Amino acid sequence: MTLSLNIKLYILSIGVLFVNASKAQEKQILNPKTTDYNILWIVADDLGTDLGCYGNDLVYTHNLDRLASESVLYKNLFTVTAVCSPSRSSFITGMYPVTIGVEQHRTRFKKQLPDSIKPITEYFKNAGYFVTNGQGNKGDKEAKMDYNFNAEFKDLYQAGHWNKRAKAQKFFSQVQLFYPHRPFQKDTANPIDPDLVKLPPYYPNHPLARKDWALYLETIQLVDVRVVKILKQLKEDGLLDKTIIFFFGDQGRPHVRAKQFMYDPGTNTPLMVRYPDGYKAGTISKELVSNIDIPAATLALAGIKKPSYMQGRNFLSEDHERAYVFTMRDRRDETVDRIRAVRSKKFKYIKNYYTDRPYTQYNNYKEMSYPMLPLMHVMFEEGKLNDAQRPFMDSYRPAEELYDLEKDPFEINNLTETPEHELELEKLRSVLNKWVQKNDLGVYPENQIEINAAQNKASERHKKTLKKRKLPQNATYWQLVEYWENELLKK
């Protein structure tokens, strides 16, 4: 027997949804003329911190680098999960996906949000803003929502572009950029030499891996081209100096051991906030920010009171400083899993609930889309992976992981068995356990009908993809590697 979402929410600590009204108001650092400013979110899809302004000296992102120089740049924005639909459901509500029952990706039988929870678009419309979600062109074309709850575009948004508003009406707009989501695209204007790319040590130094990485960076460069067009349009419309701009990603890199997982490359994404008056332009913040904090800050900039239930915090306020960010993994398409993690500035603790399943339990999207995944399967079977690469491909995963992010930024050396880190392990284990008890609906198993629907859909996609690629239905990893080598290295 499955419990209804509202009953589950009651069983959870309801206190998380209704913050004590007597809590002191956050003091705002910035006090803009909120009645004069529009607000724009530019959201990239699957974007890691692989930009020039974040230290990558190979990628050509001069427009985003210029935007960063005019913005406050945040180094430590982490998404609550590393896949699009739960992440997007969170940053449109300011809530953890596991608190409001939107944690699974994707859900075939979507439900309404709990009665008390509203997308922030509702608060902006009630405040008189014109609310849009588009692709940044004046054609008014609607853009991706990808929310894991029942939501019609017309109920949340009034148009695809801000130019449809009444004269002088303020707007809260989103522009969705598909890139650098797979499939990657070539940037013929600024191609990247695969021999020059710097791969993380947990990837094999193989021509196929380097080519895939180079194409990822080239696709990021196309994001850069798209962003400058949006900024140019704002300027031509006389709106650039009247609009607060947020630029961020819905999660991190679309790569092995990144997207869908709790390591930093999957959850760490750029965040820039540009103010019309040049407030703190060119400054860098290393404070921890969760992407559920973005809607809270956005409401504050508009002078709209944050609803008491919202878990996100206004990271623009002086008294905001997160000690931790929390991230989570649940079912991803047909792949059932449960991982929770807590991160401080120095350490990360990961709890794996399904230790009987490998990290790489089958997922059709990744197996068919990531050239590096079948490559690493093959190299694992042939004994060609090193100590940094092998653990993620193994049939075993530990119940707990602990990483010193200052000494080990690639999260390779698990410290759970080292006596000198026992106190840190106990502390973060306790922090995460308390957070789970207070916030996490994922303790309740998902309806099997939903899981079956996801698995059937994945099976259909698997068959269609192999047929399109003219591969047998029982194609081996060796055959998939050969396919990708023909596609990426020989054309």
PLM regions with names:
Residues 445-458:
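Short, charged, surface-exposed hinge/linker loops at domain edges
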Residues 1-9:
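Positively charged n-region of N-terminal signal peptides that target proteins for export
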Residues 430-434, 450-451:
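Loop/helix patches that line or flank the sugar-binding groove of alpha-linked glycan CAZymes
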Residues 2-3, 22-400, 409-430, 444, ...:
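Formylglycine-dependent sulfatase
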Residues 8-18:
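Bacterial N-terminal signal peptides
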Residues 436, 443-444:
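A short N-terminal helical cap/helix-turn-helix that marks the beginning
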Residues 406:
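C-terminal helical cap and adjacent loop that interface with cofactors, partners, or active-site loops
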